[in-house]
């Protein structure tokens, strides 16, 4: 019963659309109706930038921090309280799932990158560091957020095998689930990348 309460709480917490809330409150803009219609930092930056570039950067950074924290902080607390790895991984998946399929937005949501990073920094920090380096490099070169995010995700998955080479493949199941969720949410971006229609943001 305790685990079910934790799972429900984490899903509801992960579902909070901080980007949407910040953009509505501070910029009086509904990012669900503009840009990519995503609730993440990239769309916050893209949409708010048209009206107030300085505010756009602040709101985008705040969105990243809050989306990151809503996964990282609960996991840190649960890890400190010595909950087992199975529960921690379930919490990580649910936080990301909540962000991508928010109950408050009729199961729509963001792309899961910041929330995923928040969850994984607690469980697989070296892999997240590797992914972050790739994200920065690809972002600097191509200036395309989705491309940088997908490259970082690929680096994360590959490095999870490199740094944990002695583990059996089925133990990587949560990593595959998380990767699948994020790739699924990026399908429109992937299509635009293929047809060279994706906008530069970074």
Swiss-Prot record:
InterPro entries: G3P_acylTferase_PlsY. It catalyses: an acyl phosphate + sn-glycerol 3-phosphate = a 1-acyl-sn-glycero-3-phosphate + phosphate. It is a multi-pass membrane protein. The chain crosses the membrane at residues 3-23, 61-81, 87-107, 118-138, 144-164, 167-187. One of its GO terms (molecular function) is acyl-phosphate glycerol-3-phosphate acyltransferase activity. It is an enzyme of class 2 (transferase). GO terms for biological process: phospholipid biosynthetic process. GO terms for cellular component: plasma membrane. Pfam families: G3P_acyltransf. Keywords: Cell inner membrane, Cell membrane, Lipid biosynthesis, Lipid metabolism, Membrane, Phospholipid biosynthesis, Phospholipid metabolism, Transferase, Transmembrane, Transmembrane helix. Its main location: membrane. Pathway: Lipid metabolism; phospholipid metabolism. Its EC number is 2.3.1.275. It is found in: Cell inner membrane. Catalyzes the transfer of an acyl group from acyl-phosphate (acyl-PO(4)) to glycerol-3-phosphate (G3P) to form lysophosphatidic acid (LPA). This enzyme utilizes acyl-phosphate as fatty acyl donor, but not acyl-CoA or acyl-ACP. Belongs to the PlsY family. Probably interacts with PlsX. This is Glycerol-3-phosphate acyltransferase. It comes from Campylobacter jejuni subsp. jejuni serotype O:23/36 (strain 81-176). The lineage of its organism: Bacteria, Pseudomonadati, Campylobacterota, Epsilonproteobacteria, Campylobacterales. The gene is plsY.
